[in-house]
Amino acid sequence: MREEGGVMYEYLAKVTRVIDGDTIEVEIDLGFKIKHTTILRLSGINAPELRTPEGVAAKAWLAQRIEGKSVAVRTFKDRKEKYGRYLALVEYHDPKYDNQWLCVNTVMVVEGMAVKM
């Protein structure tokens, strides 16, 4: 992942819930057995709204890949969007690509599940 302005923070986290195609709930491991649950908005992309068939498909696509799994999360210092969610880049292991770490934000755009903002 590359830095997109501002200081970035990187954490390991477990995705506890996929809320929609571009919003997830994660349990972040802060170290020393300290964990924090928060909601993240996938940075730089926009998925269709859940009230549409495309939105339902985007949520299902995302859930299949990361829900309940460990991910790497990069957040931006003091970068919250209008609903108070932190913006994040999220990487996951994809068995389709020899378990390489892939940026889910980018893969969603490439596979037509979201558009770049």
Where on the chain are the PLM-derived regions?
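Small beta-barrel nucleic-acid-binding modules, primarily SNase/OB-fold domains
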Residues: 1-117
